[in-house]
Amino acid sequence: MKPSILEKLQQLGDRLEEVTHLLGQPEATSDMDNYRKLTREHAELTPVVEVFQNYRLAQSDLADAEEMLSDPEMKDFAAEEIEAAKAKIGELDTELQKLLLPKDADDDKNIFIEIRAGTGGDEAALFAGDLLRMYSRYAERNRWQVEIVSANESELGGYKEVIARIVGLGAYSRLKFESGGHRVQRVPATESQGRIHTSACTVAVMPEADELEDIELNPADLRIDTFRASGAGGQHINKTDSAVRITHLPTGMVVECQDGRSQHANKAQAMKVLAARLNDAQKREAQAKEAAERKSLIGSGDRSERIRTYNYPQGRVTDHRINLTLHKLDFVMDGDLAEITDALIAEHQAELLAAMGD
């Protein structure tokens, strides 16, 4: 391990002692904001320091085993202990480097997930519905809540576009690599000849902004229109102009919201989605620049990139960024995404570790 990393770990250990001392003071709770800040810092530092303590213990075990090598009667035993200690040190070294990786400030946030049908017409819209169900089932597995923010339904039951809000700790950290092009290969229900069709959808995952106050939205930059909410096929489903469309004039971004119970609720939700989109655009620009510098495939923020194919006849799912193929399509479409998300996170961490070593 690099001396600079060892020094950093020692500093973190010293800081944990200091934070523990501060939290133990009688007046610690007099300033609740500072108390919460210290509690959060304590929770972040503790796992790092504990692993570092195990690392130093393994180093001590290695030194003891190396001393035993000089004793002929203990030589074989010492060799086994040395091998075990070196393996343990290697594992802990990797774990420590992962713990020291820079944290994404958005990882714990709720998300907006936007699914748009692309090429493939009605079949693409049906696939958009399948993707929404997949992410909803995954959210259920993680005990997250799913709210439909806006939906433009197709006549056959799918979605031309749908935006959902997923509420739960770590939602963004687990789903942020889902952004991009998703392709499906299957025989549509409307296909009489049994031919396989290829359709596509685009998924965008955006962290929810903490507060609208954090986003600079000049009222002069917004055009707000109201209209009647409509259901599938375009029929009006109420008699008041409760649906809201907000256009951000500088960027041309348009957000529509009509699923709320009132115009006020729809406007508030649309503003949240707009704030998330603007944040996301800035984030993707920074990610693209960073990814170009280190030739990253994961987390590049490129929405035009085809990231995954769902092949129904073969029952397989392939993530093209990491060359991962799983022959468990039914399980994946039912929300069993852990194997895919874990692999993507691991690959992203490997890229960050490689960058640390440069």
From Swiss-Prot:
<dbReference type="InterPro" id="IPR050057">
    <property type="entry name" value="Prokaryotic/Mito_RF"/>
</dbReference>
<dbReference type="Pfam" id="PF03462">
    <property type="entry name" value="PCRF"/>
</dbReference>
<dbReference type="GO" id="GO:0005737">
    <property type="term" value="C:cytoplasm"/>
</dbReference>
<feature type="modified residue" description="N5-methylglutamine">
    <location>
        <position position="235"/>
    </location>
</feature>
<dbReference type="InterPro" id="IPR005139">
    <property type="entry name" value="PCRF"/>
</dbReference>
<dbReference type="GO" id="GO:0016149">
    <property type="term" value="F:translation release factor activity, codon specific"/>
</dbReference>
<keyword id="KW-0488">Methylation</keyword>
<dbReference type="InterPro" id="IPR045853">
    <property type="entry name" value="Pep_chain_release_fac_I_sf"/>
</dbReference>
<dbReference type="InterPro" id="IPR000352">
    <property type="entry name" value="Pep_chain_release_fac_I"/>
</dbReference>
<keyword id="KW-0648">Protein biosynthesis</keyword>
<dbReference type="Pfam" id="PF00472">
    <property type="entry name" value="RF-1"/>
</dbReference>
<dbReference type="InterPro" id="IPR004373">
    <property type="entry name" value="RF-1"/>
</dbReference>
<keyword id="KW-0963">Cytoplasm</keyword>
<protein>
    <recommendedName>
        <fullName>Peptide chain release factor 1</fullName>
    </recommendedName>
</protein>
<comment type="similarity">
    <text>Belongs to the prokaryotic/mitochondrial release factor family.</text>
</comment>
<comment type="function">
    <text>Peptide chain release factor 1 directs the termination of translation in response to the peptide chain termination codons UAG and UAA.</text>
</comment>
